[in-house]
A protein has these predicted regions:
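His/Asp/Glu-rich, glycine-adjacent segments
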Residues: 1-104, 113-120
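Alpha-helix capping and helix-loop boundary segments enriched in small/acidic/polar residues
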Residues: 77-81, 120-134, 183
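Outer-membrane beta-barrel and related beta-rich outer-membrane complex signature
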Residues: 31, 122, 170-174
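Secreted, luminal/periplasmic, and some membrane-associated catalytic domains
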Residues: 56-58, 64-70, 127, 141-206
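Sec/Tat-exported extracytoplasmic proteins
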Residues: 7-10, 93-98, 116, 137, ...
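Beta-strand elements within well-structured catalytic alpha/beta cores of enzymes
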Residues: 6, 90, 105-114, 129-144, ...
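Glycine-rich loops and low-complexity Gly/Arg-rich segments
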Residues: 41-46, 133-136, 183-186
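General structural feature for long, well-ordered alpha-helical segments within catalytic domains
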Residues: 2, 86, 136-139, 192
Length: 206
C-alpha cells in the first residue's frame, strides 16, 4: 500500500497513521509498517488499537478518549456523530504525533465509515444518508481549514477516494418500475440455526 511505500521511500522515517471507525478501514490504508492504526470499539465507547502496533495506548490517546467517551454499546458508527468523532481523532493524531512538522513527508489515512454503514442500511435516498453526507461535508471543510493553518496551504497533498458507490433502496426502484429486490437475510437465520443444532449440536450461530 501507499503507507508501506512511503515508509520504504523515506528509509522508514515517515510517520504513517490510520484512523477510522471500522478496524479494517483504518488498518488497510495505513499498511503493514504504519506507526499505528486507530479504530472505534463500540463495546468500550472509544478508540482503540492493536498490540500489533503497541502494547498500550499512548497517554495522549487515553486523555483524548476521555473527551469523546460514550456509554459502552452506543451506536456511533451508524450515525452522523461517527463522522465527527473520526475527524476529532484525526486532528488529535495530527497534533500529538506532530505530523507534517519535519523534513520528511508523513501520511494520515482517514476513512469515513459512517457513510458506508448508513448507505447500506438506508439506501442513497434516505434522510439518514442525506444527514451523514451533510455532516461529512461540514467536518471535511473544518479539517481542511485546520490543515491550512496547521501545516500550511501548499504544504500538504490531499486526495479523496471511495471503495464503492451506493444504490437506491429496492422499494424506491420498484415504485419506478425498475426490477429490484432485497435479500432478507433474517429469513435464513432460523433454518440455519436449526441445521447447525441438528448436525453439530450448536444452539445458535447467528
Amino acid at each position: 500500500g501507499i503507507g508501506d511505500m512511503l515508509k520504504v521511500a523515506t528509509d522508514y522515517k515517515a510517520k504513517v497513521f490510520g484512523v477510522a471507525l471500522k478496524d479494517r478501514a483504518s488498518i488497510l490504508p495505513a499498511g503493514h509498517a504504519a506507526n499505528a492504526a486507530y479504530w472505534w470499539d463500540t463495546s468500550a465507547g472509544h478508540f482503540i488499537t492493536s498490540t500489533y502496533y503497541m502494547n498500550q495506548l499512548p497517554e495522549w490517546v487515553k486523555k483524548f478518549n476521555k473527551t469523546i467517551q460514550v456509554k459502552p454499546g452506543t451506536d456511533v458508527k451508524g450515525v452522523p456523530d461517527g463522522v465527527t468523532k473520526t475527524f476529532q481523532m484525526a486532528k488529535a493524531v495530527l497534533d500529538n504525533e506532530h505530523l507534517g512538522e519535519g523534513p520528511v513527508t508523513d501520511m494520515l489515512a482517514i476513512s469515513i465509515s459512517s457513510t458506508d454503514i448508513i448507505g447500506h442500511a438506508y439506501g442513497t435516498r434516505g434522510k439518514e444518508n442525506y444527514d451523514v453526507y451533510m455532516r461529512t461535508d461540514e467536518e471535511l471543510a473544518k479539517f481542511l481549514t485546520y490543515l491550512d493553518s496547521k501545516v500550511g496551504k501548499g504544504n500538504y497533498l490531499f486526495f479523496l477516494s471511495a471503495d464503492h458507490g451506493g444504490m437506491h433502496n429496492a422499494n424506491v426502484m420498484k415504485q419506478h418500475k425498475i426490477p429490484a429486490d432485497g435479500y432478507a437475510a433474517w429469513n435464513e437465520i432460523k433454518p440455519l440455526n436449526a441445521a447447525f443444532k441438528e448436525k453439530y449440536g450448536i444452539e445458535k450461530v447467528a
